[in-house]
């Protein structure tokens, strides 16, 4: 296989992906670098990216609006899966990577490129997600990974870029590395590399501090149909608008901040700061409506598989047979997950204060009550307990 001459680069506008453009041309002999930036709802951040790529030497600069598929095809399945990596991180950044990689491959096919490239470094998770996804979708395409191979320090990378007129967005005054999409923000590097250092308020952008959040609680109703959130406070919304509304409501009350130590795929621990107000709110509400509408054995099994689903996505296996099989289980489990969850937002907390399902609630008040309306047959308990505990009694008879 000869050297790739036409390459589509996953472009973010940051230092590494900007430096990749001249580096691919000079060091790899690539003749045409096509920069592709994904619009995932990050807003104004994309305004200057197109021209920035051209200034860095790209032959063409493309921006793809992926907000709708990002929310509908990636975020909403994660909500139905209650996806929390290591029980805490809702995959706000990880969910975007297979979508970007998929579009990278599609553009390469459309433009007859013979390679694709990314600017991920050798220490992060994203290199794994891009490489595994591209390998699964297009094993014939050449994959170029200059930032993993060039061996330059951060300072050397910046200096290399400056020779080509690339101005770094990070300075000593703003030393943080930030990734942003509609699901939230991830912040790392700088002072945050000390896991005992409290993050300053300046690192947060979409959640209020507790001090600045409202002094009165807010009650919010979230309606689910087949496990999908479809309305907030009685107002039906399409998925993108619903995520925006959930972000606004939860973020205003200071909910959705995470400060965690996370185990990366490559084997190292990292300190990560996340803001994911809407996604965490919706997952919490979804867990609650499931508790009302699903039987115990299905809940227990789904709980175990949810962690596996989150692990697969975090580790780059969105397009894998096991992930697809788990999707089938989760899709079936959501057929009766219908109803409304009521939450109270206040000072960084979300408390579930009510839940109801007109058609699918498994909570039967006549069976659960301790009042005079009680229809539970108490006499049946004795025989049930005898049979239920029989293995323990047999064990005791034989061994004690």
From Swiss-Prot:
Coiled coil: none annotated. Its main location: cytoplasm. Pathway: Amino-acid biosynthesis; L-arginine biosynthesis; L-arginine from L-ornithine and carbamoyl phosphate: step 2/3. Its EC number is 6.3.4.5. One of its GO terms (biological process) is argininosuccinate metabolic process. It comes from the Bacteria. It is an enzyme of class 6 (ligase). ATP binds at residues 10-18, 38, 119. L-aspartate binds at residues 121, 125-126. It catalyses: L-citrulline + L-aspartate + ATP = 2-(N(omega)-L-arginino)succinate + AMP + diphosphate + H(+). It is found in: Cytoplasm. CDD domains: ASS (cd01999). InterPro entries: Arginosuc_syn_C, Arginosuc_syn_N, Arginosuc_synth, Arginosuc_synth_CS, Arginosuc_synth_type_1_subfam, AS_cat/multimer_dom_body, Rossmann-like_a/b/a_fold. Signal peptide: none annotated. Belongs to the argininosuccinate synthase family. Type 1 subfamily. This is Argininosuccinate synthase.
């Amino acid at each position: 296989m000869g050297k790739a001459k036409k390459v589509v680069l996953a472009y973010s506008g940051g230092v590494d992906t900007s430096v990749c453009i001249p580096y691919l041309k000079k060091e790899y002999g690539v003749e045409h670098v096509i920069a592709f930036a994904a619009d995932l709802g990050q807003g104004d951040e994309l305004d200057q990216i197109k021209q920035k790529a051209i200034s860095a030497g790209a032959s063409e600069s493309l921006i793809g609006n992926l907000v709708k598929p990002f929310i509908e095809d990636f975020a909403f399945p994660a909500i139905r899966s209650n996806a929390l990596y290591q029980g805490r991180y809702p995959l706000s950044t990880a969910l975007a990577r297979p979508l970007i990689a998929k579009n990278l491959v599609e553009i390469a096919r459309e433009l007859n490129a013979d390679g694709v490239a990314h600017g991920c470094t050798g220490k992060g998770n994203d290199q794994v997600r891009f490489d595994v996804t591209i390998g699964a979708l297009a094993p014939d395409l050449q994959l170029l990974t200059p930032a993993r191979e060039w061996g330059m320090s951060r300072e050397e990378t910046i200096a290399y870029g400056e020779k080509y007129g690339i101005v770094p967005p990070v300075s000593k005054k703003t030393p943080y590395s930030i990734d942003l999409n509609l699901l939230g923000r991830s912040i790392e590097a700088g002072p945050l590399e000390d896991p005992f250092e409290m993050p300053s308020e300046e690192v947060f952008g979409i959640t209020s501090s507790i001090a600045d959040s409202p002094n009165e609680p807010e009650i919010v109703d979230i309606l689910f149909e087949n496990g999908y959130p479809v309305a907030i406070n009685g107002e039906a919304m399409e998925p993108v608008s619903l995520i925006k509304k959930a972000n606004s409501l939860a973020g205003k009350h200071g909910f959705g901040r995470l400060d965690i130590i996370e185990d990366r795929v490559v084997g190292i621990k990292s300190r990560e700061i996340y803001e994911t107000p809407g996604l965490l709110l919706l997952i919490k509400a979804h867990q609650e409506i499931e508790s009302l509408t699903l039987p115990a054995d299905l809940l227990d099994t789904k709980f175990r598989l949810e962690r596996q689903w989150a692990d697969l996505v975090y580790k780059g296996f969105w397009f894998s047979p096991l992930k697809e099989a788990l999707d089938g289980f989760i899709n079936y489990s959501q057929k009766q997950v219908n109803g409304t969850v009521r939450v109270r937002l206040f000072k960084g907390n979300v408390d579930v204060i009510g839940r109801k399902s007109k058609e699918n609630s498994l909570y039967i008040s006549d069976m659960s009550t301790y009042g005079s309306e009680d229809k539970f047959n108490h006499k049946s308990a004795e025989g049930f307990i005898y049979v239920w505990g029989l293995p323990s009694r047999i064990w005791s008879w034989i061994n004690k």
